[in-house]
From Swiss-Prot:
The active site is at residue 450. The keyword NADP does not apply. One of its GO terms (molecular function) is delta(3)-delta(2)-enoyl-CoA isomerase activity. Residues 708-729 are annotated as: Disordered. It comes from the Bacteria. This is Fatty acid oxidation complex subunit alpha. HAMAP family: FadB (MF_01621). Substrate binds at residues 296, 500, 660. Its EC number is 4.2.1.17, 5.1.2.3, 5.3.3.8, 1.1.1.35. NAD(+) binds at residues 324, 343, 400-402, 407, 429, 453.
Length: 729
């Protein structure tokens, strides 16, 4: 044994050839700060071996290196800029020394090589991969950019266009694509990986392969003519501006850095990468996006822990087969859980099957599946007008009309047709689960399972625990939701549960702004362009359906009369009474016409202004700051109340529900992350300016206490140790 660290070791394989093996405790390898330091020590040992002829890098895990240890990021990002820059220089010196070894090097890459894992193998001369490879640089999705030389080596290896596509979008690619663009040199079966890598290494040692020529381009300026450079970088900057926008500085920073570094050799190019990385790491956007990643891991880990002792449902059923029911059936069948789809008439069944078939055909058109797979999936969806097959199902989700009497009747009838251990769930969006449970003989087998539309796109499923829902019931539906590829978050019961409960105060803030003379077009523009929502409140109401919102608003007002009962006729009332229901009938805040792809396209409609004039004061202008404050304060206050009341368990789950269920701007990280970034004291000062607007603007006492003590909702993060302690030399 030449060297043994906590996460890697170095040993001789055969005469003159050494292997460096990543083998961290636990299930995966991560390139954390300790591993970078250990890698530097191992390379130091290699540099002393006069008889070294070649080096093989490999992993003892199912994946090569899954990336950096993102749990370290928030503390690293708090390190002062100069110290963070020093540590990056040290880390890059390690990879440079790997790249500069006076012998050929090869990485045998299995499974994932992402982020720092990808940057590590870019420093070797050759890369041989297994068919299950996923390799790439996802850093821009975390609000940063590659910091271990990825923005320097990848463009010089692949050419600017291919590298920019991966780096700016934070993409990873599979084995075939990696081979095609030159990111790996070959793909072999897993059992042949080391043997194949050794064969390449021997050819390089024997002079049959020119490893020095392979290495040289990574040390030099990027080989691009002025015209080629102008075209590549101009197109890339345009694409990034269009897709990422101003709220996500990392992608455009990465492109500009690669452009600036193009004319330099490795050392100066790495300095430019360092100078770009460090300021990005200190942005609120990076903290928010890293926070989302960590919250996502936490939520998924919680679901995994919850379901460890239950069997995932093997057969499901859906009651009510409109667009929503068809979407749920498709998602279940697509993820290998056969589903019975029941309705009371053929027309609805046809609509549900058509929705499922449409979604499968889209997969076919995109080349994700072939005709055989399509036929196989569709054959596992069984439409029926009766309860045939219900005696075999493990879980049933009801998705009928949002009417408590209808839902109770359907659920009570279904309970008599299923096994005693079958779980029933309702896809209600607002009706309390404990109220629906009153119609059942086995309320312990019943809970809420709130999917979001469109089902195939929206990652969140709210799992609602009623007063009598058993732990096993909750675990079973969490297991089914996870199997469907969704992110389940368990909440406690109340009108609207969590997501709709906090959404309707936001809509109430919108209604009050319109009542006070604001223009809905400006509100939408501010909330989209400035705050960052995917759609403004008027457009969102049109998509949700004005009639749906009108009904849900009444349910919420009955549930929380002190805050959500309004004493005036608002814009939603006016549009509802005028039969303007949004996209579903082509008339809402906007008029809708189908574009060439059959999608609704919004257009101005002067008739709306006349309708709104009946329920509004004369038009007046509001500042962007006032619009954002008046829209967001009611939502954030309600989010805090939900945490204080135990409707949602943690700030992490609340923020993920908002991001995954409502499209809360990821660069803000969710309501609690936004609140922490703003500061509770500053938020309180802002909210108190608007408390005259009514109870929705009254800050909860718990938040007032946070403001008094200047406490955050997320646990404070300590800066990483001084860089000297991180072994920088």
């Amino acid at each position: 044994m030449l060297y043994k660290g906590d996460t890697l070791y170095l040993d001789w394989l055969e005469d003159g050839i050494a292997e460096l093996v990543f083998d961290a405790p636990g299930s995966v390898n991560k390139l954390d700060t300790a591993t970078v330091a250990s890698l530097g020590e191992a390379i130091g040992v290699l540099e002393q071996q006069s008889d070294l002829k070649g080096l093989l890098l490999r992993s003892n895990k199912a994946a090569f290196i899954v990336g950096a240890d993102i749990t370290e990021f928030l503390s690293l990002f708090l390190v002062p800029e100069e110290q963070l820059s020093q540590w990056l220089h040290f880390a890059n010196s390690v990879f440079n020394r790997l790249e500069d070894l006076p012998v050929p090097t090869i990485a045998a890459v299995n499974g994932y090589a992402l982020g720092g894992g990808c940057e590590c193998v870019l420093a070797t001369d050759y890369r041989l991969a297994t068919p299950d490879l996923r390799i790439g640089l996802p850093e821009t999705k975390l609000g940063i950019m590659p910091g271990f030389g990825g923005s320097v080596r990848m463009p010089r290896m692949l050419g600017a266009d291919s590298a920019l596509e991966i780096i700016a979008a934070g993409k990873d690619v599979g084995a075939d694509q990696a081979l095609k663009i030159g990111l790996v040199d070959g793909v072999v079966k897993a059992e042949k990986l080391v043997e194949g890598a050794m064969a390449i290494l021997r050819q390089a040692i024997n002079g049959d392969l020119d490893w020095k020529a392979k290495r040289q381009p990574k040390l030099e300026p990027l080989k691009l003519s002025k015209i080629e450079a102008a075209m590549s970088f101009t197109i890339a900057k345009g694409m990034v501006a269009q897709t990422a926008g101003k709220h996500y500085p990392a992608p455009i920073t990465a492109v500009k850095t690669i452009e600036a570094a193009a004319r330099f050799g490795r050392e100066e190019a790495l300095n430019l990468e360092n100078k770009s990385f460090v300021p990005l790491a200190h942005t609120n956007e990076a903290r928010a996006l890293v926070g989302i990643f960590l919250n996502d891991q936490y939520v998924k880990g919680k679901a995994k822990k919850l379901t460890k002792d239950v069997e995932t449902p093997k057969q499901a059923a859906v009651l009510g087969t409109g667009i929503m029911g068809g979407g749920i059936a498709y998602q279940s069948a697509w993820k290998d859980v056969p589903v019975v789809m029941k309705d009371i008439n053929d027309k609805s069944l046809t609509l549900g099957m058509t929705e499922a078939a449409k979604l499968l055909n889209k997969q076919l058109e995109r080349g994700k599946i072939d005709g055989l797979k399509l036929a196989g999936v569709i054959s596992t969806i069984h439409p029926t007008l009766d309860y045939a097959g219900f005696d075999r199902v493990d879980v049933v989700v009801e998705a009928v009309v949002e009417n408590p009497k209808v839902k109770k009747a359907v659920l009570a009838e279904t309970e008599q047709k299923v096994r005693p251990d079958t779980v029933l769930a309702s896809n209600t969006s607002t009706i309390p689960i404990s109220e629906l449970a009153n119609a059942l003989e086995r309320p312990e087998n019943f809970c809420g399972m709130h999917f979001f539309n469109p089902v195939h796109r929206m990652p969140l499923v709210e799992i609602i625990r009623g007063e009598k829902s058993s732990d096993e019931t909750i675990a079973k539906v969490v297991a089914w939701a996870s199997k469907m590829g969704k992110t389940p978050i368990v909440v406690n019961d109340c009108p609207g549960f969590f997501v709709n409960r906090v959404l309707f105060p936001y809509f109430a803030g919108f209604s009050q702004l319109l009542r006070d003379g604001a223009d809905f077009r400006k509100i939408d523009k501010v909330m989209e362009k400035q705050f960052g929502w995917p759609m403004g409140p008027a457009y969102l109401l049109d998509v949700v359906g004005i009639d749906t919102a009108h009904h849900a608003q009444a349910v919420m007002a009955a549930g929380f009369p002190q805050r959500m009962q309004k004493d005036y006729r608002d814009a939603i009332d006016a549009l509802f009474n005028a039969n303007r229901f949004g996209q579903k009938n082509g008339l809402g805040f906007w008029r809708y016409k189908e574009d060439s792809k059959g999608k609704p396209k919004k257009e101005e409609d002067a008739a709306v202004d006349d309708l709104l004039a009946e329920v509004s004061q004369p038009k007046r202008d509001f500042s962007e700051e006032e619009i954002i404050a008046r829209m967001m304060i009611p939502m954030v206050n309600e989010v805090v109340r939900c945490l204080e009341e135990g409707i949602i368990a943690t700030p992490a789950e609340a923020d993920m529900a908002l991001v995954y269920g409502l499209g809360f701007p990821p660069f803000h990280g969710g309501a609690f992350r936004w609140l922490d970034t703003l500061g509770s004291a500053k938020y309180l000062d802002m909210a108190q300016q608007y408390q005259h607007l009514g109870p929705l603007y009254e800050v909860p006492e718990g938040l007032r206490n946070k403001a008094r003590h200047n406490e955050p909702y997320y646990p404070p993060v300590e800066p990483a140790r001084p860089v000297g302690d991180l072994k920088t030399a």
